[in-house]
Amino acid sequence: MIDLTKLQNIVDSTNINLKELDVLNFLKNRKRWPLRYPWGQPSVEILSNAGDTQSNYLFDADSYLNFNKWEELYNLGYTSIVSNILDLTDDLRILQKKLFNKTGLNISGNFYFSKPGQQASFDAHKHSYDVIVKQIYGESTWSINNKSFLLQSQKSCIVPKNSVHQVLDKNVKKLSLTINIE
């Protein structure tokens, strides 16, 4: 059985210093962001105010991200989900290696990247797997199983599988790293 507290300690002890400009620069590398990865997962999505994700209109005819289209929505305050990101920096690669060594699982990670203006998160939902969230910068108010708390910069939380959760607000620019343990 996987000890989530030990994994959270690994996440907490791994320094990940990223700023908004870093993520913007990652997204300008358009060939890194296909419409879908070979396994079918979208690389970049926008969370709509209807509570679902949209991605097709963010991509050019060659199926790679159009940064300008994406940036327009980001600047309006829409949350972006940037998937499969644990290879982007040395710190993220180190974190992935540490988590793999502890679990034997190919751990995946996503960024939730946003600024104030639109819906903060998916409506309350749950996953069939555990998630560890690290707030890289900014802060947001979370609810996990009807308990609300403020997740601050460089802090983390565990979202146990089948827990009803959501981000309730985002009043500042924020970058969250979600680590899916599945």
Where on the chain are the PLM-derived regions?
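N-terminal auxiliary "cap/dimerization" subdomain that precedes the catalytic jelly-roll/cupin core
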Residues: 1-79
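Active-site region of the double-stranded beta-helix
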Residues: 44-155, 163-182
